[in-house]
């Protein structure tokens, strides 16, 4: 069975769970702890960066407001997920895939991280020239031919070649 690793802040995760009326269902461990690699018995593990942030004097203010710190931390968590996919086979922290939610592009920009989204960050980090965003559901899988483009601009950007590339990927 799959093990899911969540990179983030335990405080923010608990606040979000409370707002959404969800009981926390994850096991939590300090992201730097050697225990992080031994938690195979737990299906969902939150790799908590709060202790490290506290030591470094970094405090996430409101999880509902864009600022430089939240942008830097969001970027850091995505980079951690990417790095986990690049770990060697057999490494207990290796990930086979990354699942993401939306990022706050304003917060990333405030942190000096100028990417239209994490799709482009993942592609650049992994040195990929051909890449696409994919949505996966129970009955439907969709690979997008364009990403991060305003609807009004699609008619000027979408080409047969882009559609074929998406199909090929």
Task: Spell out what each predicted region is.
Residues 1-118, 160-169:
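Contiguous, glycine/small-aliphatic-enriched amphipathic segments in soluble metabolic enzymes
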Residues 118-143, 147-152:
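Flexible loop/hinge segments that line or gate small-molecule binding clefts
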């Amino acid at each position: 069975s799959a093990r899911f690793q969540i990179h983030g802040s335990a405080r923010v995760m608990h606040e979000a769970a409370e707002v959404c009326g969800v009981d926390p269902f994850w096991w939590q461990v300090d992201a730097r702890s050697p225990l992080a690699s031994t938690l195979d018995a737990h299906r969902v593990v939150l790799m908590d960066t709060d202790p490290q942030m506290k030591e470094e004097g970094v405090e996430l203010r409101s999880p509902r407001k864009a600022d430089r710190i939240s942008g830097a931390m969001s970027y850091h968590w995505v980079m951690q997920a990417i790095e986990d996919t690049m770990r060697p086979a057999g490494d207990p922290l290796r990930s086979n895939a990354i699942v993401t939610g939306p990022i706050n592009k304003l917060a990333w920009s405030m942190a000096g991280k100028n990417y239209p989204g994490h799709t482009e960050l993942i592609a650049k980090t992994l040195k990929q020239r051909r890449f696409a965003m994919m949505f996966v559901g129970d009955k439907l899988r969709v690979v997008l031919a364009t990403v991060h483009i305003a609807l009004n601009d699609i008619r000027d950007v979408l080409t047969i070649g882009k559609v074929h590339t998406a199909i090929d990927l």
